[in-house]
């Protein structure tokens, strides 16, 4: 069996892996990047996550406003999504494939030992088949995560989908049941409701969006229900009864018939078949690779992105790359400890942006806080956009004026929330935001009113 020797081996063509490969190559280092599927160049976000789902959201909202039929809107949105994703995937591949120091190999990888990986499949850009071994000085694992499928009877039915399959339906379902009331489920609820699908969300929790303050969660639920989405809390799914024409979700709280069922039940580490134990790589109780603050799984093996148990966002995977890059090519000062606070966005309609502490968390931590809220309907730009649903909230230390947290459920929240990453990192006081000059009419100028009480 032929053995290839390389300085850097990257397993997985995700955000961190592809960016690190290009950077190392630009610094004169040889890189082999192994990816199991040629449909995953660029990682989850580009192919089966953020980009296709957001494209469907945008197309659905835009076309629905034109009063087209639900089926026509759905078909046009799918065509737009299907036209975009292959272009992005090809661009990601070409960027690395055109680099002299990078070799991309389509194959499945498994560890032989801490420095050796066996690859099976198409082991070269020309597509030759076979099994080879790669011996590397350094190995980086960036294999991401995959949908977690609960062991429920009937879950293998043809009309039961995970978050990947639901992005590629040939026809619009008239009725959809979403199992799971978390953020992924909410995004798809808004998406398919915009297409005209009847949507029901089932969640085994008794509390809707338990991580959010009750006023924010209540407003989100109000918006969903006002648009016709049904929400059932505190129900346990017992089985899926599948027939040729529909799937019935049987729960502790009744039965729900659907043309499509979405499992929005979380994600698990994509490590199956890697034989991590042969390399001395340990995983935690949830199956994610255990790493230190510099993303080392072992002295010569790093893990980056979802597979390392990092928060499951593409921009966090990019930050993982920065940590590793700083160790290899910089001063080695960056670590996971540097990102205790970062913004998040849920692409509902309106979007939900958040950073820092909620009011509930701040009070539980013993902080003396002042809180301000502002209804989106009070914002002139929201009226211009015709998007007056939502609620804005700021949590501030009552003594120092330090901004502890901000939650924005309103139009453009996914953009505006990023301002508060810089504000909190630089300890900008609430009074500065209150008196800041913003353009008009914009959603951002509402921050003057939101922070006026401080």
Where would I find each of the regions flagged by the language model?
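Gly/Ala-rich phosphate-binding loop of Rossmann-like dinucleotide-binding domains
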Residues: 21, 25, 189, 193-194
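Glycine-rich flavin
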Residues: 2-6, 16, 23-29, 33-172, ...
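Glycine-rich Rossmann-fold phosphate-binding loop(s) that bind the pyrophosphate
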Residues: 12-15, 179-182, 306
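FAD-site-proximal beta/loop scaffold in flavoenzymes
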Residues: 156-171, 255-331
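FAD-binding beta-loop-beta segment adjacent to the flavin cofactor pocket
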Residues: 147, 287-300, 381-393, 397
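Flexible, glycine-rich terminal cap/loop adjacent to redox cofactors
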Residues: 9-39, 43-44, 51, 55-56, ...
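Short hydrophobic core segments
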Residues: 9-11, 109, 133-144, 179, ...
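Short glycine/serine/threonine-rich phosphate/pyrophosphate-binding segments
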Residues: 16-20, 160, 185-188, 271
């Amino acid at each position: 069996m032929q053995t290839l020797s390389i300085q850097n081996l990257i397993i997985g063509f995700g955000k961190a892996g592809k960016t690190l490969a290009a950077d190392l190559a630009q610094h004169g280092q040889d890189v082999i990047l192994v990816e199991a599927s040629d449909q995953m160049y660029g990682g989850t976000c580009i192919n089966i996550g953020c980009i296709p789902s957001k494209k469907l959201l945008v197309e659905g909202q835009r076309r629905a406003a034109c009063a087209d039929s639900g089926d026509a809107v759905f078909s046009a949105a799918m065509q737009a999504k299907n036209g975009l994703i292959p272009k992005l995937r090809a661009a990601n591949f070409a960027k690395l494939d055109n680099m002299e120091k990078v070799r991309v190999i389509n194959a499945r990888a498994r560890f032989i030992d801490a420095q050796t990986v066996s690859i099976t499949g198409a082991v070269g850009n020309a597509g030759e088949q076979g099994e080879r071994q790669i011996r590397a000085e350094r190995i980086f694992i960036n294999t991401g995560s995959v949908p977690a499928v609960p062991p429920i009877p009937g879950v293998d039915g043809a009309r039961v989908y995970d978050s990947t399959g639901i992005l590629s339906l040939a026809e619009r379902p008239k009725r959809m049941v979403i199992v799971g009331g978390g953020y992924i489920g909410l995004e798809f609820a808004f998406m398919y409701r915009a297409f005209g699908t009847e949507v029901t969300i089932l969640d085994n929790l008794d509390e809707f969006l338990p991580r959010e303050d009750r006023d924010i969660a209540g407003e989100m639920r109000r918006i969903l229900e006002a648009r016709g989405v049904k929400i059932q809390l505190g129900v346990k799914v017992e089985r899926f009864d599948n027939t040729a024409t529909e799937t019935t979700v049987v729960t502790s709280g009744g039965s729900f018939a659907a043309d499509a069922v979405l499992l929005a039940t979380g994600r698990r580490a994509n490590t199956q078949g890697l034989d991590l134990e042969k390399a001395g790589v340990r995983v935690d109780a949830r199956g994610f690779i255990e790493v230190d603050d510099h993303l080392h799984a072992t002295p010569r093996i790093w893990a980056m992105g979802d597979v390392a148990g990092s928060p499951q966002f593409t921009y966090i995977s990019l930050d993982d790359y920065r940590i590793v890059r700083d160790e290899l090519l910089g001063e080695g000062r960056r670590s996971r400890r540097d990102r205790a606070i970062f913004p998040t966005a849920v692409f509902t309609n309106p979007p939900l942006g958040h950073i820092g502490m909620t009011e509930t968390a701040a009070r539980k931590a013993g902080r003396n806080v002042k809180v301000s809220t502002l209804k989106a309907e009070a914002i002139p730009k929201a009226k211009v956009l015709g998007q007056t649903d939502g609620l804005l909230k700021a949590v501030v230390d009552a003594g120092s004026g330090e901004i502890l947290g901000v939650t924005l459920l309103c139009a453009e929240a996914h953009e505006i929330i990023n301002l508060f990453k810089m504000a909190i990192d630089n300890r900008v006081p609430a009074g500065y935001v209150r008196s800041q000059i913003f353009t008009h009419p914009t959603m951002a100028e509402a921050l003057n009113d939101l922070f006026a009480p401080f």
